[in-house]
Amino acid sequence: MKVFLGLLLGFSIILILTYQSPTTQHPPKEELAYWCTYAKSCDFCWDCQNDTCINKVINESISITSIVNCRVTRDSQSCFYDISVKIPNHHSMECSYPRLYEHEMFMEKWRDEYWPIIIKQCCFYLVFSFAFAGCVAFAICKNLRLRTTIKLLILLSILVWLSQPILNN
């Protein structure tokens, strides 16, 4: 019985030590002071109205253009910021020895105008995935050689790659 209780206690300690909170864009209010101290531009730290944003922790106000989209998570030892929508940028630190995120020039500005871009990208990739599937189906129906099929797929890949700058505008 003592062995069983010892194993149960050890297992619960391991679970506590390896606990990881889920990634969230809305940390609890009691944790906002912690998260907003070390990455000040995260959107969950600010209450924005009429192009002016007020910090929820220290009541400081800034322009809306310097706010970025952030997600946060933590495990037993480290705290992790996932910053941006298009180009991933990460900041991790030990929760007990936090450090300020000072590379705000790499943080992408977040505004509601990104939603049309995200929707456009999703539609674009959906159309091109149908094009890839159609290319493979065409090659199978016409009984084309593998070399010809690969050339068609490479051509479609080049078109996708070349259209990226246009899509991101």
Curated annotation (Swiss-Prot):
Intrachain S-S bonds: none
Family indicated by similarity: Belongs to the asfivirus MGF 110 family.
GO cellular component, as recorded: host cell membrane; membrane
Pfam annotation, one family: v110
Name used for this protein in its record: Protein MGF 110-12L
Keyword Transmembrane: yes
Lineage: Viruses, Varidnaviria, Bamfordvirae, Nucleocytoviricota, Pokkesviricetes
Function: Plays a role in virus cell tropism, and may be required for efficient virus replication in macrophages.
Membrane association type: Multi-pass membrane protein
Bilayer-spanning residue ranges: 2-20, 121-141, 148-168
InterPro entries for this protein: ASFV_fam_110 (IPR004848)
Keyword tags: Host membrane, Membrane, Transmembrane, Transmembrane helix
Subcellular location: Host membrane
